[in-house]
Amino acid sequence: MLQQWLRQSPGAARFLRGSCCRGPQSGSLRHSPLPTAPHRCIRSLQTSATESKEHIPLRKQLKQNAKALKAQKRQKRESEEASRQKWELTVGIEIHAQLNTETKLFSRASTSNTDTPNSNVALFDLAFPGSQPEFQATTLLPALRAAIALNCDIQPVSRFDRKHYFYHDQPAGYQITQYYAPFAKNGYVDLFPHDGIAPEDGDHVRIGIKQIQLEQDTAKSQEYPPSTQLLDFNRVSHPLIEIITMPQIHNPATAAACVRKIQAILQSCSAVTTGMELGGLRADVNVSIRRRDEAPGTHQYGGIGGLGQRTEIKNLSSFKAVEDAVIAEKNRQIAVLESGGVIEGETRGWTIGSTETRKLRGKEGEVDYRYMPDPDLPPLIISHDLVSGLRDSLPTPPDQLIEMLAGPEYGLSIEDAKPLIELDDGARLEYYQDVVDILRDLQQDQDAKSRAGLARMAGNWVLHELGGLCAKADLAWDAQRVPAETLAQIIDQLQRKRITGATAKQVLAMVFDGDRRPVPQLLEAENLLLRPLSRDEYIALAEAAISQNPQMVEQIRAKNQLGKLGWFVGQMMRMGEKGRVEAQKADEILRELILGKSDQP
């Protein structure tokens, strides 16, 4: 059968004769028996191009990939820098924030967003003929707190206007706002590197706030493709403030940082209950570009001229969306202008994950919206005494809190100070300060050196150890789960070296899981108190570790590779009874035995 196949396949016969057969090649195939086992002269048949390539070790592949990625990032940075040098980006932001109120702006209906759809609706909310707006004075208080916290001038007299447009989420055919005479003007927000501004913006950026105005929210739409859309009018007339910044932002990262900072300020003064993550805050960005080497643009906004034609990107619902949408629109406008096109004023949309914005409609202006004073609402009069009282009652601003926590009193890093302020509406910060105060009282008998790092140590335990337990258990913050006094006692025992760090974490976990025994009693009952090793016990452990690794000892002595002492410390801690070997004492004994250096007097 093989001979028949070979007769039908002359190429195969030639291959076998030339590669595998011994003896004269002119001989007959019948006189050349086929080998019964693999022979070193048999060649493997390549069936794919990839198999013939030289094998590259995995480590080398990873290095090559990392190098290529690094080069790609460098090229991207260089391209962005070249673009930044050629084109100037200008961004202004409009932030819509739902106020922390129990009633709607112009009716007594509830603002609860958890009730059944269309259950909190007054006649005016649905624009029933003959219904009139009734301004709810309590809705003004959180708006004033926000404006004061954003350094605005509160206007003693402001007025309401009608902004006309027809859309299914606005039953009246107009929105009540404060276009001509807002209640707050001329504010600002300061941004710093820890807020996330772009490195090109330096150490400080101040973004002006043109105005803050009260206005109604619209109904909530819910689409059911292909053709059904449901409306929940519970949200109609929910009190909003619209915060309009000046066009003084020139970097996408700084635009996102500005929105993030404003949200943090609004939350710190209880002006809002939720942020972007739950839909309580939305942002529109106005984007324009112009060439730096050409004459200033012909457009102006908020008193700032020389700008290019702007476009507006609506309803951005996250900080990342703000940054990505600005980048996408900047790139689109640059591409249009470099190809000889013209930027048109229009409203555009952006979808999460997209790299392009899309046109929604032409940009409406003042004439299109037909602004007019609302004849059913009187002027809004705000007294100086009310503003002064609210100003005095505001909590410490976030920037001042960060400065305090990073100062000499607490000594925290900016990275630890920020989450303490931002987490849990200030409850985490209050808990931390309680822990520090109690801990300082417990440590009054200790020397100044021992007490110096108490606040930093407490910050680590509150944020990372206790915070990590909450995250692992997927539980909301609860200051009573581990009372501040209990955590302070655990840290005190650790600081006095009565327990090890591992034991302290074990005790914290026990209390977190519900153990309510006092800390001293718990330590005694569970036999967790540290029994220090004697000097002889340390020497025995060190000699055992040294005897097992003579080559490493010689490297430390001959080449002065002191970093390897840490490895021996780890070996001693593993060999000794859990929690009893102290790293500092182990290091001292090792230096004495290996280097002949002793810290003993």
UniProtKB/Swiss-Prot annotation:
EC number per UniProt: 6.3.5.-
InterPro entries, A to Z: Asn/Gln-tRNA_amidoTrfase_suB/E (IPR017959), Asn/Gln-tRNA_Trfase_suB/E_cat (IPR006075), Asn/Gln_amidotransferase (IPR018027), Asn/Gln_tRNA_amidoTrase-B-like (IPR003789), GatB (IPR004413), GatB_Yqey_C_2 (IPR023168), Gln-tRNA_amidoTrfase_suB_CS (IPR017958), Gln_synth/guanido_kin_cat_dom (IPR014746)
Keyword Nucleotide-binding assigned: yes
GO molecular function: ATP binding; glutaminyl-tRNA synthase (glutamine-hydrolyzing) activity
Keywords in alphabetical order: ATP-binding, Ligase, Mitochondrion, Nucleotide-binding, Protein biosynthesis, Transit peptide
Annotated compartments: Mitochondrion
GO-annotated cellular components: glutamyl-tRNA(Gln) amidotransferase complex; mitochondrion
Enzyme class: ligase
Gene Ontology terms: biological process: glutaminyl-tRNAGln biosynthesis via transamidation; mitochondrial translation
The organelle targeting sequence, given as a residue range: 1-52
Role description: Allows the formation of correctly charged Gln-tRNA(Gln) through the transamidation of misacylated Glu-tRNA(Gln) in the mitochondria. The reaction takes place in the presence of glutamine and ATP through an activated gamma-phospho-Glu-tRNA(Gln).
NCBIfam families listed in its UniProt record: gatB, PRK05477.1-2
Protein family (similarity comment): Belongs to the GatB/GatE family. GatB subfamily.
Binding partners and assembly: Subunit of the heterotrimeric GatCAB amidotransferase (AdT) complex, composed of A, B and C subunits.
Protein name (database record): Glutamyl-tRNA(Gln) amidotransferase subunit B, mitochondrial
Native organism: Neosartorya fischeri (strain ATCC 1020 / DSM 3700 / CBS 544.65 / FGSC A1164 / JCM 1740 / NRRL 181 / WB 181) (Aspergillus fischerianus)
